[in-house]
Amino acid sequence: MKKFLFMCAGTLVAVAAFAQEPTTNWPYLYPEFKEGELNVRSKTEKALFNIHLDLGALHYVEDGRIKEANILNASTLVIGNDVFRNVAGKMLKVLVRAQGGYIVEETRATYSAVVRNDGAYGTTALNSTTTKTFLYNENAINQYNGYLMTDVYKDLLAMRDDAEKLPVRKNLYIVIGMDQIPADKKSVASLSGLDKKALKAFLKSEKIDWNEIGDLVKVIDYIIANRNK
């Protein structure tokens, strides 16, 4: 098996990374905005960044206010030890870089878990436009990036813990070239250019566990070696 070329330290200390869980007032990956570098073409933009957990929008702080970054031409984002790649307009965390591809992780908020039957979202309606700020960037890919109680960074940070915990789910993807493939048997088997019978035999012989990063690297190697042959 080929050696991993890159593995984010965050995958080994996931619990520590989420010492502060996201809340309904703070739907972000990190407990505060962090210094990072966004690579856009040949330029590097530095700012305080965070990932909104609704549609993967990249937010940053400018003059004390939260704004959405235009990532149309962005390639990568580095925040501390975490590396993100622009995958179909979302900044997804890179867990492993292998020969010819990547394993990335998407963290998404599960709002339905905190929306009560009466439609309440904490103490305000989920679709409220009177108590929440709607961030909009006409140049951004994700025109909808969720509601915030305020776009003033220090005020939103002060509200962070005065809310319900926001459950999240994590989705793994295999990225090869322009293909973003959900890391599951059905999605890989549906790829064009692969012999379904041979793939089935490979998955069985290797006892592929779709939750194991090492096994997903094997799948990447197999796809690259056998697709369109």
Describe each PLM feature range.
Residues 21-39:
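Short N-terminal segments immediately surrounding and downstream of signal-peptide cleavage
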Residues 49-180:
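Aromatic-patch recognition
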